[in-house]
Design a protein with these regions (language model features):
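Short alpha-helical segments that sit at the start of domains
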Residues: 1-21, 49
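Conserved ATP-binding subdomain of kinase catalytic cores across diverse folds
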Residues: 4-8, 48-51, 60, 64, ...
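Generic anion/oxyanion-binding catalytic loop in active/binding sites
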Residues: 9, 28, 39, 66, ...
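Short amphipathic alpha-helical interface segments
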Residues: 13-42
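Alpha-helical DNA-recognition elements
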Residues: 56
Length: 141
């Protein structure tokens, strides 16, 4: 997903979509996938509103609907939620281009209300670490 898409989604997200993304983020540590009912309970929303928000988030590719396991939060959804939170707190006013993509994090330009340039770093916890791959390969030899 491009930075332009993510910036647009930060502006376009409805309150209910943000509540659902926040529920995903809260429950992410304990659950890989979530069903509609658990999201509704955690977000304190009516199930019909949750279904509507999930449909919209899935169309934007911020979550993934598995045919059998329920809904999964993807990196783009977590990134958009983080940018929304930073913008809501007044930390950033806008985002720019991608500065770099590393093995464990992505970094992008941002600007605050005073025009100061900032860098926003997204850690990719699930990304394969080269060090761990090398260690495992050495153990097999």
């Amino acid at each position: 997903m491009s930075m332009l898409d993510m910036a647009r989604y930060v502006k376009e997200l409805e309150d209910e979509e943000v509540k659902v993304l926040r529920a995903f983020a809260r429950m992410l540590r304990e659950h890989e996938s979530l069903d509609e009912e658990s999201i509704a309970i955690n977000a304190r929303m009516h199930i019909d509103r949750v279904r509507y928000a999930l449909k919209r988030l899935n169309e934007k590719n911020l979550i993934y609907k598995s045919p059998s396991k329920g809904y999964h939060l993807v990196y783009a959804g977590l990134d958009v939620l983080a940018l929304k939170e930073l913008a809501g707190r007044g930390v950033i006013a806008g985002v720019g281009r991608m500065i770099g993509i590393g093995k464990e994090a992505d970094v992008l330009e941002a600007v605050d209300d005073n025009g100061r340039m900032l860098a926003v770093k997204f850690f990719r916890i699930g990304r394969v670490s080269f060090r761990s791959v090398a260690r495992k390969r050495m153990m097999k030899d």
